[in-house]
Amino acid sequence: MKRRLIIAASLFVFNLSSGFAAENIPFSPQPPEIHAGSWVLMDYTTGQILTAGNEHQQRNPASLTKLMTGYVVDRAIDSHRITPDDIVTVGRDAWAKDNPVFVGSSLMFLKEGDRVSVRDLSRGLIVDSGNDACVALADYIAGGQRQFVEMMNNYAEKLHLKDTHFETVHGLDAPGQHSSAYDLAVLSRAIIHGEPEFYHMYSEKSLTWNGITQQNRNGLLWDKTMNVDGLKTGHTSGAGFNLIASAVDGQRRLIAVVMGADSAKGREEEARKLLRWGQQNFTTVQILHRGKKVGTERIWYGDKENIDLGTEQEFWMVLPKAEIPHIKAKYTLDGKELTAPISAHQRVGEIELYDRDKQVAHWPLVTLESVGEGSMFSRLSDYFHHKA
């Protein structure tokens, strides 16, 4: 097999599956010590996990459940079942008065008979973490909480959230309700990507409704050094203190999930440590461009002498900043040589990415053009040159 050096990765100007983790990079920096039940730091662009602890442990999500509630609402808007301007009449089961389920919990402070838009109920769900807003939306979209929970679990299955099962629309403690830091990072990534109508609400610092002003409980929104613009907090006695925070640093976005911290300040500090570590130590680079040439090879017995090779896919990847000078890309042909005729987009080898001497990723190498069979004269000439 022939191996060709393409270029150092520092000169590349990649979408990788979320199954690829930073641990695949042999020389990843030491992650921070995190004091929580479980945690994840994910790169938004690639879905790569940069560091994690107990990431698939099933835990009580508390109000992080509302991320899925909001996701289902947005899917209903996307499918034109509802619009953000639809007016919802609040029913009795969404009114906290004389409702033991809501005692001591987060509320938007809706009243039975209130007429509220889907947009404002979504703000109440996101900013106030209003359990009453969740119920009002569930009743309007699905005709009841039980039916809405079924929709939530259907979407969890579609998103391959294997550690997740919902029993409520709001996240109050319920037997059988659980998720994981990994699943919630995947869900958060889907929300950021697929909710342009509502994602900006996650950065709103306060909401006034029925004369009551409440602040967003995500304290990192006030940290001017972090550029955090979401997502959500959660807390119950059974869950501890949970937080998902997403921050933008230049063109990069990271998602930090902390579950089971010991206090509201503690969850913020642990998320802050994760985000800063990710921002300081990693960079997101495009390794390969679809259709861009990575090499040229001699082709025998064709109507031309050389053929361009590349990839059919876009590849992004998160790499440790300190390792960029040591990243090399090479390609290997499957056989000793290429012979015509050959079609475009045909696999002829493999592109390999190395960190120092360790292979960290690989992708198919394909032809970027077709080469037909040459004339009798050119094939005869190639024969003698080839055998020489």
Curated annotation (Swiss-Prot):
Span of the signal peptide: 1-21
Coiled coil: none
Lineage of producing organism: Bacteria, Pseudomonadati, Pseudomonadota, Gammaproteobacteria, Enterobacterales
Keywords: Carboxypeptidase, Cell inner membrane, Cell membrane, Cell shape, Cell wall biogenesis/degradation, Hydrolase, Membrane, Peptidoglycan synthesis, Protease, Signal
Location, primary (coarse class): membrane
Location(s) in or outside the cell: Cell inner membrane
EC number: 3.4.16.4
Catalytic function, reaction form: Preferential cleavage: (Ac)2-L-Lys-D-Ala-|-D-Ala. Also transpeptidation of peptidyl-alanyl moieties that are N-acyl substituents of D-alanine
Pfam family, one: PBP5_C
Alphabetical list of PANTHER family matching this protein: D-ALANYL-D-ALANINE CARBOXYPEPTIDASE (PTHR21581), D-ALANYL-D-ALANINE CARBOXYPEPTIDASE DACD (PTHR21581:SF5)
UniProt-recorded name of the protein: D-alanyl-D-alanine carboxypeptidase DacD
GO terms for cellular component: plasma membrane
Domain of life: Bacteria
SMART domains, alphabetized: PBP5_C
Entries under NCBIfam families matching the protein: PRK11397.1
Sites where the protein binds substrate: K232
GO MF annotation, one: carboxypeptidase activity
Membrane topology: Peripheral membrane protein
Similarity comment: Belongs to the peptidase S11 family.
Organism: Escherichia coli (strain K12)
